[in-house]
UniProtKB/Swiss-Prot annotation:
Domain named HTH psq-type: residues: 12-63
Cell compartments where the protein resides: Nucleus
Name of this protein: Tigger transposable element-derived protein 4
DNA-binding region as annotated in the record: 39-59, 108-139
One GO MF term attached to the UniProt entry: DNA binding
Length: 512
């Protein structure tokens, strides 16, 4: 009997549905493969094809990153990211901090915060709709539950919470080379040891002291591999000693009080942001919560992290040892310059330009070891590997004090070089509501300050008689003298190359 022919087109088509795995299951698969289990057995166990397993292993880094950073709910099956990535990261960071502080968060509060972050980040077209909020909660696995009654009465130490929960969140997101801290400090840039006890603890000195004060802003990264250019804030935009200069080794700003202001801070942050953008880097900069440190909108490469006001200065890395090291080195140089004047029977003068050059020199000399130790003492423990640096630099000031005493510099009895360097640590450095008595006033000529300066000096410490800028031929002659001196010493290749660079630069200039 003939068999009836069957038309294949009439048969029902069975399509096997592709199995979707959650991120959690993909993590289990990755662990199984790396433990040595056969891929065929793993594929059979999870009901997937071998090429699907290969695809999971190919995207292993993305899966692990999403799982470890809690950017997605582990039960989710796809790693579809959001359009407003920076907004979502900021919102999730805020949510995690609220959780740490036992602050109950609900939908309306999250919507309000999302709109607030959108405005600060420059997303003017963003509106937090119910649909967007639902998708956001789904992406991150957020479920709002009523807070247990007993939890509301538990006392929380904000400082402990910040160290245990908030700081590690940042350190997990950023490599130590991209974690920065900045800090202001006041400096009486011409203060020699004479009569220094009269100035200890002053917050806004008067008269000549006020005139001779500047604010420094120092900043480094966490692993000590990078120091931000010093920001120096003086009183005059173009002091006498800067006349004719087109460049300085530091960033320089000026205002009446020589303080950090919100405008100066924002301008500086935007300048740094451009530099980090050019390097294609993302960094976090920790700053104190001051009116002079506003939130700066639309930064592309910098995330500003503000220390809670409840934290003490011990959490500020720059305060632990970096500023101390810089000031000790600076005081060393200042006294040495004075000693040189005494030995040469010359009147000692020290201008703001001298201070800027000296600060740049000393800033370069602050070691990575000192920086790393300062961060560790401030509680910054790297989540990406422990530091192997145990000892910071040690400044030896005993010989310097002895030399200074021998040359006639009066060190008050018991005053160490460290104490001398720290005498201006309490100077105000940021804009605030000033007390009328602390505003700088004019000092009479009869006031004694212990400064070795003459009455002919300008406010910036430079001599009243203007000296002409050297010509190109004079610069070449000076360089020849410098080369002869250096080549009589044991000079390395780096200095030889630097001399060649200097000569090429001078020769490239048009004659004046």
């Amino acid at each position: 009997m003939a068999e009836a022919s069957v038309d294949a087109s009439t048969l029902p088509v069975t399509v096997k549905k592709k199995k979707s795995l959650s991120i959690e299951e993909k993590i289990d698969i990755i662990n199984a493969v790396e433990s040595g289990k056969k891929k065929a057995e793993i594929a059979a166990e999870y009901g997937i094809k071998k090429n699907s397993l290969s695809s999971i292993m190919k995207n292993k880094d993305k899966v692990l990153e999403a799982f470890e950073s809690l950017r997605f709910d582990p039960k989710r099956k796809r790693l579809r990211t959001a359009f407003y990535t920076d907004l979502e990261e900021a919102l999730m960071r805020w949510y995690r901090i609220a959780q740490c502080l036992n602050v109950p968060v609900n939908g309306p509060m999250l919507r309000l915060k999302a709109n607030d972050f959108a405005q600060k980040l420059g997303h003017n077209d963003f509106k937090c709709s119910n649909g967007w909020l639902d998708r956001f909660k789904s992406r991150y696995g957020l479920v709002f539950r009523a807070q247990p009654v007993e939890a509301t009465g538990v006392p929380v130490d904000p400082s402990t919470v910040w160290y245990q929960n908030v700081l590690p969140y940042y350190l997990n997101d950023y490599h130590p080379k991209n974690v920065f801290n900045i800090k202001e400090t006041g400096l009486l840039y011409r203060m020699l040891p004479t009569n220094t006890f009269a100035f200890k603890g002053e917050t806004c000195s008067v008269g000549k002291l006020c005139k001779d004060r500047i604010t420094l802003v120092v900043g480094t990264n966490m692993d000590g591999s990078e120091k931000l250019p010093l920001l120096v804030i003086g009183k005059k935009r173009t002091p006498h000693c800067f006349k004719g200069l087109k460049s300085l080794p530091v960033c320089y700003e000026a205002n009446r009080m020589a303080w950090m202001t919100s405008d100066v801070f924002e301008q500086w942050m935007r300048k740094l942001d451009e530099e980090f953008q050019a390097q294609q880097r993302r960094v976090v900069i920790f700053v104190e919560s001051f009116p002079a440190h506003p939130e700066v909108k639309n930064l592309k490469s910098i995330e500003l992290a503000f220390f809670p006001s409840c934290l003490s200065s011990k959490c500020i890395a720059m305060k632990q040892g970096v500023i101390k090291s810089l000031k000790i080195k600076y005081r060393h140089c200042l006294i040495k310059k004075f000693l040189s004047s005494v030995e040469g029977s010359k009147e000692f003068t020290f201008s703001l330009l001298d201070a800027v050059d000296t600060l740049h020199l000393c800033w370069r000399a602050v070691t990575p070891e000192t920086i790393v130790k300062s961060y560790e003492e401030a509680g910054f423990k790297s989540q990406k590997g422990e530091s192997d640096i145990t000892n910071a630099e040690k400044d030896t000031g005993l010989d310097l004090v002895a030399d200074a005493l021998g040359a006639g510099v009066e060190f008050p009895e018991g005053l160490s070089i460290e104490e001398y360097a720290a005498l201006d640590d309490d100077l105000e450095t940021c804009e605030a509501a000033p007390n009328g008595d602390s505003i700088c006033t004019k000092e009479s000529k009869s006031d004694e300050t212990g400064f070795y300066t003459s009455d002919e000096e300008d406010d910036d410490g430079s001599p009243g008689t203007e000296l002409p800028l050297p010509s190109k031929s004079e610069a070449i002659t000076a360089l020849d003298t410098l080369k002869k001196f250096l080549r009589s010493q044991d000079m390395n290749d780096g200095l030889q190359n630097s001399l060649a660079d200097l000569e090429n630069f001078i020769n490239s200039l048009s004659p004046k």
